[in-house]
Amino acid sequence: MVYVISIEGIIGSGKSSLMDQLKRHYTCHQEPLHDWSLLQPFYDDMERYASPFQFQVLFSFHKLYSTIKNVNDVVILERCPWSSRNIFTKMLVQDGFISPQEYELYMSFYDRLAFTTNLHIYLKVDPTVAFDRILKRNREAEKTLQYDYLVRLNHQYEAEISKCDNVYVVDANKPMELVGNTVLRLLSRLCRR
């Protein structure tokens, strides 16, 4: 049976860098940014694209979970449906970008898709550090990203992750090599590799 681990954290927390280290040892699936054609339009116009983009994310996770559900091993994901629902979609509802009716529809799909994540590894990072990393990597889709959004995202993560029983928190303000070594040691203990 598959054991799903999700790497969680705000934008710029080091998820992709960590995944690059982990994929040498484990089956890893990074966020399918190439499948998210609505990501850039969402960043440019959240009001218009919030709901369609969150559905696109949800369906991409459904596709991914369909391919891994029969794997008899550890599979590590860069984010998971939990964060789509509890972090991003909830924030968009709070901001009025997703209506209560759209949220109800989203939740009905989410509940029917029955996603399971066995462990969340949360990369806890100061939004200032994350914003600096975002500026340095200079991704086209993130050029309009605002610091205030990261702060709010961080607050949402802190509030929601504290409700999880199956979470391991890692200080991601440290250099990514140290973060990677910490996570590899954890996974080695958990997975006996």
Swiss-Prot record:
Q: What is this protein called?
A: Putative kinase protein 029R
Please name the source species.
Answer: Invertebrate iridescent virus 3 (IIV-3)
Which UniProt keywords are listed? Answer: ATP-binding, Kinase, Nucleotide-binding, Transferase
Looking up Gene3D superfamilies in the UniProt record yields:
P-loop containing nucleotide triphosphate hydrolases
The top of its lineage is:
Viruses, Varidnaviria, Bamfordvirae, Nucleocytoviricota, Megaviricetes
**Broad EC category:** transferase
Q: Which family does it belong to?
A: Belongs to the DCK/DGK family.
Positions of the catalytic residues: 78
Q: Which GO terms describe its molecular function?
A: ATP binding; deoxynucleoside kinase activity
Identify the residues that bind substrate. 31, 43, 54, 79, 142
Which parts pass through the membrane? none
Quote the InterPro entries the UniProt record gives: DCK/DGK, Deoxyribonucleoside_kinase, DNK_dom, P-loop_NTPase
Name the positions where ATP binds: 9-17
Enzyme Commission number(s): 2.7.-.-
